[in-house]
Amino acid sequence: MRYRHLGKSPLQVSELCLGTMMFADQTGFDEARRIVSHAREHGVNFIDTADVYSLGKSEHMVGELLKGQRDDWIVATKVGNKMGERPNEQRYSRTWVLRECDASLQRLGMDQVD
């Protein structure tokens, strides 16, 4: 696997990123565990999820799958898509973004994303 710097940071990420859009929806936990394991065995160290993937269930699953191996992965997530019916669910105020980032960290069971 080839690696590149993530932007101007010192982080080195695999050229392939494991996307988890279907985790917890069309991909169950056991199959997702096999996918993550296979990717890691082949040098993938970059995994991507989002708050809206399966309405947060993908983030929760990714957190469970990476327990005990968090230092082996560069984790990315995203916010910005509508997660509920409240009037300000899809706004980009500082308060909203920070709230959604905190919610993602809680679902992931992590202190930070990369």
Regions of interest found by a model, annotated:
Residues M1-I74:
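N-terminal binding-site loop/beta-alpha segment at the start of enzyme catalytic domains
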Residues T27, G84-D114:
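Glycine/proline-rich, positively charged
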Residues F46-A50, T77-V79, Q106-G109:
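Short C-terminal domain-edge/linker segments immediately following a structured domain
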Residues M61-L65, K78, W96-A103:
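Generic beta-strand or strand-like secondary-structure segments
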Residues G68-R94:
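Structural motif corresponding to the early beta-alpha repeats
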